[in-house]
Structure formats: C-alpha cells, structure tokens
C-alpha cells in the first residue's frame, strides 16, 4: 500500500473525532490534580462529549501540560511513569522504549500500548519489531493534556487495544489570541525552543500552530548529538451551532541515539551493582565517533553506509481531522488520520560480557596481532574487549485510520452508539542484524583489528562478522471492525455501560528468502564467511482473522464524593506482521476484570483499582547473540492493585502517591511455567510532595518525586535478576505576572544506578561478576523560561 499525495490531502480534510477541554491558565495549576473527579475525559467513551471521571466505570489517568512537565519526563514513554500499572523502560534514550501494562506478557517494545493523537491511533498495530507507538510521538507545547485508559472498554473501541490507550489531545485556537515562546537550557549541552500561537481567524474559524527544535549531547557522552531535530504542527477549527470540525497536520524530523545494555559489575547475587572499570554506568556509553560512520557489506559487491547518530529517529508526517456534530436526534463523531514516513534503527546491540583481548584471541586456537582501527598502535593483551553489533533496520510505514460513530438517545438516560473502525496500513522493512565489531570495553569504545599468526584475518575495519540475519519484507494489513455500545444512567446513583465488537483482519506480505554465503570465497577472511543475504525469491504471508470482544461496566455512587465501579471485558490481540513472519499465527485472547473505588473532595483524591487478567496464546520472540530467532508461545495470568491519590492537608501542601502491586506468572509456558512475567516489577510507586505559594507578583510551586522500582527478571527463565532501585527528581515552577513562567527541574539528582533491562540476547546470569544491563541515565538538569500571551 502506497498512498499518493491526494490521499493525504483527503485524509486531512476528512471528518474525525474529539472535543477537548480548553487549556487552563498556568496560574491555576496548583488547583489541578491528575485525580480530580470532576475532570471530563474523552478516551474510552462512546460519545464525543466524554464523561466525568467520577462517573466512569474504568481506570483512567489524566495529566495536564504542566503536570507532565513536573513529572520530568525524558521521553514520551517516560511520561507514562505517572500512570499506575504501567512500567516504561526508557533508559534506551528518547525512543525505542519497552512499555508494559498490568503484567501483560511481552518480550519488549509495547504491544499493549496504543498512542493516539486527538483520539486516532498513530499507527494501528501498536508494535512491530523495532517500532512501538511512543517512538512516533514527540511532546511539545502544542499538547493540552494526556489521558491514559487502562483496560476498561478499550477492547471494543478504535484499534481494540486491551492494554493501555494513551491519548494526547492538542491545543486548539479560541476566541482570544493565546500562545507561548519557551527557551530551554540544560546540562549536557541541552538546548530547546518551543513556540505555540493560536487565535481567531474569523467568525467560527480558529487556528493554532506550534512546534519545537531541540539539540543535546545527552547524559551519556556519545561524542555526537544524542538528540537532534524538531517538529511543526498546525490545526484549523471551524465551529457552528450544530458541531465542530478540526483538521490538523504535523511533521516530525528527529534523530535519537539508542542505548542498549553495557557491562556492569554485579555482587551479592545481583543485589549490588557498580560501574565496569573504564565505563561509567551513569554517564558512559560504548557509542562514539570511532564507529559513528560505517560501511556494511550486504552482498557480493554491495554495501550500505550508516550513521550511528541517526539512532531510532523518525521522519514522519501526520494529517488528521476530528468532527463532532448533531443531525436531528443523532450525534455523529469521526476520527481520521493518515500517517506516512520512516522509522529507522541504527544501534549498537551488545552480546556477551567482556573478556581480556588475550582470552579472546586464545579462543581461535592461535596467537595474533591486534591494532586499533583508527590511530593504529598495538592493543594491550590485558585490555578488556567485547563484541557488539551495528544493527540496521529500515522501516517505511504508512497508515490510514477512520473511527466513525453514530449516537442516539433511546430514552431518558440511555444512549446507544454504533460505530465502524477501518484501518489500512503497511510496513516496508529492510534489516541487517549482526555486523559484530571487536571493541574495547570502555567509554566511547574503539574498534580493533585482529590478525592471527596462522594467517587468518579475524576482522575487517574492526568487524568480526557481517549480517547474521538479513530481511527484506513488504507487508500490508487491513482491519475492519463494527461495534455497538450502550450507556445507561439508570438513576442518580447507578450507571451501566456495555458493548460488543466484531473485527476482520487481512494481512498479506512478501518476505524474501535468504542464504548464508562466504562473500569473498576466502575461508581465511573469517569476518565474511557466514553472511546472510536476501535472495530475489520470496515467500508469501497471507492470513485472515476474525474475532469478537465485549465489555460490561457499572458505576455506583455511594455518596456525592465516592463511588465504586466494576468492569469485565474479553479482548484479543491479532497477529501482526512479525508474528506471522515467524509462524506465530494464533490470536492472543485476553480476559480482564476490574473492581475500583473513587473518592474525592477539596482536601483529597483517591483511586483504588484491583485487576485480574488472563492471557492465552502469548508469543515470545528474541534474536539471540548467535543469530538464533528464538520463539515460543504460552499463557499467563496477573492480578494486582493500583493506587492513585493526593492529600492536601493544609494551605498549598499536596502529598501525591501512585503505585501498583503486581503478581504476574507464566502458565503452560514450557519450562518457564510458574516464573514471574519478565521485565515487570512486583511493586513500584511514586511519592510526590509539593507546595504552592501565592506571591505578590505571581505564584511558586516546588516539588519532588521519590520513585521506587521493585525487583524484576530480565528473561523468561528468571535467571537474570534486576535489583530494585529508587530515584529522586526535583523541580520548581515560578509564574511572574500574567505572562512569564520559569521552570527548573532535575532528574535522578541522587545519581542512582538502576537497571531497566538485562540482556535478553544472552540468556543466563552474570558471568564472573560481570553483568550486561541497561542502566538509567545519571543526573541531569533543565531550565526553561517562557513568555505567554
């Protein structure tokens, strides 16, 4: 599927979905709360006008733009740390996160997280290999708020996501001109400018435009810009008595370095970690200029050139529209978008733990001579070395989605909604995995050339190998779903809702065959003796799936300030491109149950949610260091309790807490049955005290967040234990008069060493006290000054 420009223009002008709340003045931020029961949410509701959180029979977290800033997020995925029940591993950088929801099993990426903009998914499959939804989105000052729905009725709406739906709602123009110019500076060469402007064009016509540009060297010294790029967005809104339509466009061009596990020292059965000599865990990285620009052979006489600084960036265009209007007794809502662009991965993927150079050479059964690729000179035999691969994944993606809904009041208090969801999407993939290099195990590693005494050449420009897994694939998918939902306010206290959905999916594609060859025909050049190449011949992927989902919910008001809710749903996850390529053709089936309590008043807000989910046919896939594509399938179950609350005992003091306790286990999963679901902590919580002052010239808010992440396992076998850790973030917001805003934040100010990932490519525990893990970034600070009008 390749759409012409005319299709993009049509998508931008077509009708689409959500009526959002107006942005609130910054000075009112202290009165805002992510758990305010009177807030109106539009995510997970059948009708465009939404529902108050106190009346909702599902779990949803909201955060305003200022609350997101106070969370000190390092990326889009990192912003999800404010959501209980969600665990986002964002130590890989600004993109390429692994996000997990309520114990739902996956090996990584974010198959159970859909990111929406104004109610439309950015890409219908929430995850493909080397691409998850949060990578496609950048937060800036054009965003009004974030809503995160967990479970609930989401299996029947939009793309049927059974996990978490993250909806970013854009600011729109209003009657009065409004905007801001924000300049940001920070540690590690951070520089950023954000611009937003909005206003009225004419009677009933409104506009907004904004974007950002940012460059930073990063907390980890890569010797090149770790993040560099920006985006530009615009909306045009027309309102009339019977409705409103908004069209929008967004272009993002951003490059982001990607970080994978590095060697660390592990003691006391993994409970104590420290930096590997020569490689600082908080600020160090193997990445550097020595192998930033490389040429990789892809076949006999063919090669590609790549820049490590391109990382896991995007060059993406989004065109969309939302429309809500009345026709007689009917309400019609539509969400539509068209997305096109590229999302490459150029990253260094590590494998086994370091060893001395002499030990590495001895593994070939011969003596040898080792020199640096750049600068020459002999390498000390005692130098610690490792092999790591320069993996290249090129993805060209395209999608069109449309979510059309018709609602009608059947009788007083009862509204029926019927809808159709349609998505057509494609991905064109070219992969070169492997390309291992012999590197020094130190900050900004250096490549090593190695020649054995018996004449064998181990490396070429430091490369010990070529691609062990090459892939050329071209995939197309189409999903059509019909759904029916009913909302019934039975009386003043009881509200019921339910819905059903039936979906058809058609996926087809072409995957080229591969062969393993010796590129130069010389057995003594070891570096290219086993090169995976793509062949002209190919095999077809062609599968149709159909499935049914349902949901039932109830909310009962106990008092004016408290209510309880219950929810049951049965959903599914249809196999995506990569699943079908690897032969995982089964539909995942998910049953979920929730029981919740909500209460709130001027002095407090409280949400408690108990949940249970059960999975069948859950696949696992990982590329191991030796090139093996390991796959298996099984079941799981998880239950837990989420808490989200705030207490305001006196004056401007607020004490906020979010957290989750989780018990998730594998079932019917080969030898892994009974193990803890990998990569997800049993406990995590965030405690945020803050204080707000009203000053003669404005207002000031200071805050801090203490976060604790519990033990996890990095692998299915539960042999790589990742110890618990904690972090401390701090910040302050100062508003001066009506126009000026100043903010200062610090992330991980105590410079803690915590791991978000082990090395799934090398199953097993630490070897000789050395462990491969991906640590969180060290401390960093940001300062911004904004002028608002």
Q: What is each of the regions a protein language model found here?
A:
Residues 26, 45, 49, 77-121:
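Extracytoplasmic beta-strand/coil segments of soluble accessory domains associated
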Residues 616, 654, 707-715, 733-789:
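C-terminal beta-signal and adjacent terminal beta-strands/loops
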Residues 397-399, 409, 413-425, 467, ...:
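Structural signature of Gram-negative outer-membrane beta-barrels, strongest in the C-terminal barrel
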Residues 178-180, 184-216, 220-289, 311-326, ...:
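Transmembrane beta-barrel wall of Gram-negative outer-membrane proteins
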Residues 121-150:
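Short acidic/polar hinge/loop motifs at secondary-structure boundaries
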Residues 22-23, 605, 612-614, 631-717, ...:
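Gram-negative outer-membrane beta-barrel transporters
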Residues 76-79, 98-103, 113-116, 133-136, ...:
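N-terminal periplasmic accessory domains that precede
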Residues 237-239, 244-318, 347-391, 445-475, ...:
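Acidic/polar loop-and-plug regions of large Gram-negative outer-membrane beta-barrel proteins
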